[in-house]
Regions:
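Short helix-capping segments at alpha-helix termini
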Residues: 17-18, 130, 152-157, 250-257
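Conserved AdoMet
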Residues: 26-104
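Residue-level signal for inorganic ion chemistry
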Residues: 27, 65, 95, 122, ...
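Active-site beta-alpha loop architecture of Rossmann-like, nucleotide-cofactor-dependent enzymes
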Residues: 69, 186-189, 240
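Conserved SAM/SAH cofactor-binding pocket of Class I
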Residues: 93-192, 197
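Glycine-rich S-adenosyl-L-methionine
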Residues: 139-144, 196-228, 232, 238-242
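C-terminal catalytic and target-recognition region of SAM-dependent MTase-like enzymes
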Residues: 232-275
């Protein structure tokens, strides 16, 4: 069977996807270890039987709802490719605004803390774009291992490292100029209603407690001992709860200039506190 025939078969096989042909193209390129442009330009080329079998399996996973990023093992974020697996959330485009806000603030070799780092997308992106020293924490040893590998692959491991720990606990007694956190913020009661792609992601990276802000309450209690001068705090949350998080942040830091920053879609997504 030819490349073009396999692409047509794959498109039909992932019909449950919102973008079946695009997904089939990605999966076929992955199965054949080729670029997408090659697939499109070489429709008459034959496909080896082993590669065809592999492609069928990949399509079955996608049709069952598994996210493309988990199948391919990589996800794009802020112009770079990050290794991902089911021990971490898949980086979201809306989270890139946290990086942009941090970049506007960072001047020189400041110290940055990324709490709940996951695959290290935020931390590694900041380290790649600035001379800052970036540390990250995560409760999951598997996430920290993955983030460490991403830092190595991106060439920033000399200034970007990660530790296993609960929120900022591993860095108690240290001071930071930028603290960024994208903690679990989905209310527990909302988890069963989430669409299939999210159901493949680790629950502990999604569950924000009864109102989605449980971990942020704890983090805000820890932050006063971690702040250097000047300092920027960036916290991502869901649009329905962002106002409450902003009020909590203002209460924790009465002298701070607290604002809500929209994401690329114009949704209120980030609390920004300048101290």
């Amino acid at each position: 069977m030819s490349v073009a025939e396999q692409l047509a078969r794959g498109t039909a096989a992932v019909a449950s996807s919102s973008s079946p042909r695009a997904d089939a193209l990605l999966l076929l390129a992955y199965a054949l270890r080729r670029e997408r442009a090659w697939i499109l330009a070489n429709g008459e080329a034959p496909v080896l039987e082993d590669d065809a079998r592999n492609f069928v399996g990949l399509c079955a996973r996608r049709n069952a709802g598994e996210p493309i990023a988990y199948i391919l093992g990589t996800a794009g974020f802020y112009g770079r490719e990050f290794l991902v697996n089911q021990s971490v959330l898949i980086p979201r485009p809306e989270t890139e605004h946290l990086v942009e806000e941090a970049l506007r603030f960072i001047a020189g070799p400041m110290r940055v803390l990324d709490v709940g780092t996951g695959c290290g997308a935020i931390a590694c992106s900041i380290a790649a774009e600035t001379p800052a020293r970036v540390d990250g924490t995560d409760l999951s040893p598997a996430a920290v291992e993955l983030a460490t590998e991403n830092a190595r692959r991106l060439g920033v491991s000399d200034r970007c490292s990660f530790q296993v720990g609960d929120l900022a606990e591993p860095f108690r007694g240290k001071r930071f100029h930028v603290i960024v956190a994208n903690l679990p913020y989905i209310p527990t009661a909302d988890l069963p209603q989430l669409p299939d792609p999210i159901s493949f992601e680790p629950r502990e990276a999604l569950d924000g407690g009864s109102d989605g802000l449980t971990l942020y309450r704890r983090l805000l209690r820890e932050l006063p001992t971690l702040l250097d001068t000047p300092c920027l705090v960036l916290l991502e949350a869901a649009p329905p709860t962002i106002g409450v998080l902003a009020e909590m942040t203002q209460t924790a830091f009465p002298s701070a200039a607290v604002s809500i920053v929209p994401d690329y879609a114009g949704l209120a997504r980030c609390v920004k506190a300048s101290l």
